[in-house]
């Protein structure tokens, strides 16, 4: 009588490593780092966890460097607008086996300069030495708009900060002269491109007659 024994060899019966999810904000045109392994659970505390690779769903916008030590560097291209992306990182413990490999996720928010505002045509009666402007905000691209700036040219040039509202009165202009106006938006990343241009001509309306009989 012969008997057979089946033996299954496993790398370890210890729990798998556990990697906490990370979040990261990156400005367009810049880079940020995050230590993926800083607070990870390591079933073999006498050995280090090792990053073996990573993938990103934003390959056209992000450049990701995933060294073995887990300090992941993420660079965002310039002028790409706002986006939300994920990087999936593969991590192994001291056994260095595929069956014990785990993944960590880095959620990335890319922030960019605002889109250009849309300046509305000037409407209403002419104003004495002034022009009233209004515009529609473009996308803030992940960072709140903090300021609008109007610039003008024509019979002289200038600029005016209009705060964070979407309307502004430009004063000190010469009546009967035509000016061209543009507006830009600013957030913590920088200034948007200039808006479309509109023209306006300040003028003083004639006084109403007082001796009409």
Identify the residue ranges that each predicted region occupies.
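Extracellular/luminal low-complexity segments enriched in Ser/Thr/Pro
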Residues: 1, 68-86, 93, 108-110, ...
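Extracellular interdomain linkers/hinges and stalk-like, low-complexity segments
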Residues: 2-45, 90-120, 134, 196, ...
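Short coil/turn motif common to extracellular beta-sandwich-like domains
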Residues: 27-35, 69, 125-134, 175
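Surface-exposed or secretory-pathway low-complexity segments enriched in glycine-proline
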Residues: 34, 40-71, 102-111, 121-123, ...
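An aromatic-rich alpha-helical recognition segment common to small helix-rich domains
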Residues: 36, 117, 121, 133-136, ...
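Hydrophobic core positions of the immunoglobulin-like beta-sandwich fold
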Residues: 74-77, 123, 135, 162, ...
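Beta-strand-rich modules
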Residues: 81-96, 170-192
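Recognizes extended acidic, P/S/T-rich segments that occur
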Residues: 147-174, 194
